[in-house]
Amino acid sequence: KYLAFAHKADQENKPYAARIFRAAAEAETIHAHAHLRAMGGIGNTEDNLKEAIGGETYEFTDMYPPMMVDAENEGEKSAYRSMNLANEAEKVHAEMFKKALADPAKTPPKVYLCKVCGHIHEENIPDVCPICGSKSHVYIEME
């Protein structure tokens, strides 16, 4: 959330607040990595890919569907759309992790990320995001 807060502060021309929010976001990442290491939660790449597949699969099979039902029942269209887009993106993420697990050392293709919904696409940028319908200009290349 701190990165979203930083973006808003940038929009409001409040650079000090934006910088502090970005620093706090990075600090939280440092904390998460430290906690994960302390719990022995970082295995070898194959184990980490299996963990990632399990996590993404849980999200699109068990986590998001009931949340989407609740949002729909409560008439929260924006919340429903957000969760539905994330749910669809998680399916793609799980498939990508499966592909990486099959050959983790291969030369990676170009990978692009839709900044609207989180869809990941390999090789080239689609004209339109298959999940959210955004135009190609919203994609960024990942290193």
Spell out what each predicted region is.
Residues 1-143:
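Non-heme di-metal
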